[in-house]
């Protein structure tokens, strides 16, 4: 169903609650505002199939915009609020956005953007001037537009391995704004979500999972509680305060909550949780096991991408029987392929591809990048996100790492994820990344970049402690040849790491000293 249906049935029910302030937007208000947003687009001659963008923090208006865009039949681009003006300008240009919505919080970036991308008109929230988004929207009729048609998101990757890639998915075949989608059906069948769900969204809404899962809750008629930003202890307090029974997390969230002092963790009642969904990155086995011991068997993991080409799913009981797995296929058929695109034997590592179960479905494309689009497909027409893994005899998928992150040292393929998963379980480590740096003898050397819980611990003693910790668990070829310490790793709030930035720095430094 569409939020407009719930607005008629339960107009006063909270659709959105901002966790910190308690500001609440009812379904009636969400419906009214989204109609006005759609009317505004038409008044600016933005029609079906056009593109609009929003560069916002987790803002009360975020979903009002998203649902307005959805019922106006446009492609809507969520842009990271952490980007610089040139980075935002690139996405606006690449996507062909006709309009940008921002906020006063991002005024310095948006002011610079107005200078370097003057052709894209802006409206801003919390700005009492001629660019006021609230004023422009309030002036519009609150009735539905005459040509309502379902739109869809067009989201950009984090750019962790290069320029951000826009994932453009064709507008839905069914133009009805209230047509059910696959995610909604899966949310009910696999995750048990419903109109009674009180769903926590602790991550930035401009990313695929927070945006799509939250909008799915709105389709079901539940309540979405939005955290302005993630904080481990505040998350626990929010679960208790609002009686949260579902939410979407990433492994980094789990690590940070687990590393809270025991007395802080014990202060909060999280027994209302029935469904803690997680994805975005492989979760270290000890971390997930500890979360299940703490929260109970309520963790549900899936593997999928912004591209929407397929997914897997696993429950906590299944995972305890198959630790480390991301589950069996939920949508699409999983294939593990060699370099020629052929299936490899069961249990053998290879590149993960999804075969569509609906042969009429239109595949995604990387916007304005036909080469990247072609690289994501093999000779069978199956699509891949570039990840490597294996499938066991029962059909359970195990992730190894991204193909592009692989380190080749002395002719041996080394996947950083295995080493990173061990490092983050050390009690003095907050976060870790492993990259390949130049080595005159081996081609590449394994470098671990470690973010300590306390930067005062950084130094030779902690390095020795980490080596001693890793030694029984890693072969010598995988042991980091170099361990460096950093105050903060360049990680997205969704858990994705800008590993390219780290790797490039080591290779650039080597060139300068050559």
Region locations from a protein language model:
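AMP-binding/adenylate-forming catalytic core of the ANL superfamily
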Residues: 83, 100-102, 237, 247, ...
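Structural core segment of the AMP-binding/adenylate-forming
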Residues: 3, 43-44, 67, 71-147
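Conserved pre-ATP/AMP-binding loop-to-beta segment of ANL
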Residues: 11-12, 138-158, 162-163, 191-198
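Conserved AMP-binding/adenylate-forming core of the ANL superfamily
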Residues: 15-59, 66-67, 84-89
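A short helix-loop-beta submotif of the ANL/AMP-binding
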Residues: 51, 57-85, 94-99, 197-198, ...
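Gly/Ser/Thr-rich phosphate-binding loop
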Residues: 153-155, 159, 219-220, 244-249, ...
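Conserved AMP-binding A3 loop
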Residues: 24-28, 152-181
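Conserved AMP-binding/adenylation subdomain of ANL enzymes
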Residues: 175-198, 202, 206-246, 260
């Amino acid at each position: 169903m569409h939020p407009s249906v719930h607005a008629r049935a339960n107009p006063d029910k909270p659709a959105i609650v901002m966790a910190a302030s308690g500001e609440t937007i009812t379904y009636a208000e969400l419906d009214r505002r989204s109609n006005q947003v759609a009317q505004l687009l038409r008044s600016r001659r933005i029609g079906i199939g056009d593109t609009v963008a929003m560069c916002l923090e987790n803002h009360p208006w975020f979903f009002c915009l998203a649902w307005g865009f959805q019922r106006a039949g446009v492609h809507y681009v969520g842009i990271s609020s952490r980007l610089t003006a040139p980075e935002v300008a690139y996405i606006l240009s690449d996507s062909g956005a006709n309009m940008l919505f921002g906020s006063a919080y991002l005024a310095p970036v948006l002011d610079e953007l107005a200078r370097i991308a003057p052709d894209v008109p802006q409206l801003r929230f919390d700005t009492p001037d001629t660019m006021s988004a609230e004023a422009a929207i309030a002036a519009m009729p609150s009735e539905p537009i005459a040509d309502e048609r379902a739109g869809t998101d067009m989201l950009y990757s984090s750019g962790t391995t290069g320029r951000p890639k826009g994932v453009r998915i064709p507008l839905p075949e069914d133009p009805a704004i209230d047509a059910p989608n696959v995610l909604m059906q899966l949310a009910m069948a696999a995750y048990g979500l419903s109109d009674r769900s009180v769903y926590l969204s602790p991550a930035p809404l401009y990313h695929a999972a927070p945006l799509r899962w939250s909008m799915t809750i709105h389709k079901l008629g539940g309540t979405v509680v939005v955290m302005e930003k993630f904080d481990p202890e505040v998350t626990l307090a929010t679960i208790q305060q609002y009686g949260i029974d579902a939410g979407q997390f990433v492994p980094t969230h789990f690590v940070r909550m687990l590393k809270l002092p025991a007395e802080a963790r014990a202060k909060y009642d999280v027994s209302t949780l029935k469904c803690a969904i997680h994805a975005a990155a492989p979760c270290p086995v000890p971390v997930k096991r500890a979360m299940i011991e703490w929260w109970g068997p309520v963790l549900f993991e899936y593997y999928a991408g912004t591209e929407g080409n397929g997914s897997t799913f696993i429950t906590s009981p299944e995972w305890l029987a198959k630790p480390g797995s991301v589950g069996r296929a939920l949508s699409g058929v999983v294939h593990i392929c060699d370099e020629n695109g052929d299936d490899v034997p069961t249990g053998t590592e290879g590149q993960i591809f999804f075969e569509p179960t609906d042969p009429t479905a239109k595949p995604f494309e990387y916007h304005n990048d036909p080469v990247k689009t072609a690289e994501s497909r093999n000779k069978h027409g199956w699509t891949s996100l570039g990840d490597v893994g294996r499938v066991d005899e029962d059909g359970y998928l195990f992730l190894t790492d991204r193909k592009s992150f692989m380190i080749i040292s002395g002719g041996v393929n080394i996947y950083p994820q295995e080493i990173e998963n061990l490092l983050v379980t050390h009690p003095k480590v907050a976060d870790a990344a492993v990259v390949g740096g130049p080595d005159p003898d081996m081609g590449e050397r394994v470098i671990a970049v470690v973010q300590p819980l306390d930067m005062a611990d950084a130094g030779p003693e902690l390095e020795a402690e980490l080596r001693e910790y890793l030694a029984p668990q890693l072969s010598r070829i995988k042991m980091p040849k170099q361990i460096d310490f950093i105050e903060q790793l360049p990680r997205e709030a969704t858990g994705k790491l800008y590993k390219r930035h780290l790797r490039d720095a080591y290779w650039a430094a080597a060139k300068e000293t050559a």
